[in-house]
């Protein structure tokens, strides 16, 4: 029996942060500044991102509706992912102009997908949206020892399958329940314009990207939700290796997300030969 299950989520997350501080505190100087060179009052300060830059998108009516729909799925108490969902909706809108379907690996309550189908006239696009998840959290078979030491398995999820079925009952969405990579073959689309990967650990995420890569159309968008987060360095390293091997580039955003826009031909990378 895992004794951690007896402790509340808030305490488990606090312990993860304490472990991080204990590992890194020597690099924090006494006179360190938390905020440097902000250009006015903070316009956004949540989800690991603080900025004084323009955040007018949060007041746009279409985005506000999409975000409200996402938040209504209630992924967790205090859900505040406006900028991440702004990125999700932007990528989805650009991808909607391309041939192919939408695929999301790692769904939880469906917040990201729900924001997309609200933001776009999704049912009029002639596309399908495939949602793949266990709908009850990470499969412990696929969590490595290195990931466990980072606290990846401390996150707890409720069984959200019935909620997700209800949430998307009016949309052209196919819900595939089970662990990735076991369920990948059930996603029968031939082309993909938008692929979201958010399963919080390396094995299923790389398996999904390898499986779907050839189906992603040229110019298609691949959104990596955990790419830049400090607890998920192993995923970032794995995605970097994947992209480098295929001559692709990953845009790292201050939201923690990473974006690949699939290049038709491999991008040029300077080598030590000087060529």
Show which residues each predicted segment covers.
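S-adenosylmethionine/decaboxylated-SAM
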Residues: 47-82, 89, 96-275
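Membrane-proximal basic amphipathic "stem/tether" segments
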Residues: 1-72, 263-265
